[in-house]
Amino acid sequence: MRKKVTERKDEQEPKGGEPRRMRVDAQRKMVSLLQAALEVFAQSGVDAPVREIAERAGVGLGTVYRHFPQRSDLIVAVFQSRVDACADAASVLAIKYEPGEALARWMQRFVDFIATKRGLAAALHSGDPAYSALPGYFNKRLLPALKTLLDTAVSAGVVRPGIEAEDLLRAVATLCHGPHGAEPVYARRMVALLVDGLRYGATTPIDPPKNRHR
């Protein structure tokens, strides 16, 4: 009986590295699909034809629907992939740069994230229950990433203590959503000024949130 099972398994699984190559190909297609969806949504809105996304990704229409039966499934996946990319960049930057520079570069990455998120805004703010878990996902991934960079910069004495990661995310988002926030050059310049403000008087703590409105 065992021999038969083994033979059947050998028939189903290609030899050598073929299964691994198949997994790599599948992952590559998924990355291409999500990137294509992001670009199409940014250009044409979240109601853009799925066929347009498939053509840009170089996959069949059936592939899109097999992975994402509903349009909302695709939108959620695109949003989460952008959040993950932004969050994962924190550890990479922390290795490559000194603490203050790593924090500054990550904040510019967050500016890029907000820019890409704009193409999904109509769906994310529609009130559809399909997107209700996304704010929690955003906070779960991005707040710890920023907090680690921020705490490291504070410990190194290059950023003022007393700054909350959540406040910093909101500050950057506010700058990006201002009258000229949609202009990448403007948003980057404003965030660079914000970073300079964090560095100024690095040994002077900022009042914690509970004391700010007394």
Protein language model features and the residues they cover:
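Basic, helix-initiating cap at the start of DNA-binding domains
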Residues: 1-56, 73
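A secondary-structure capping/hinge motif
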Residues: 72-74, 119
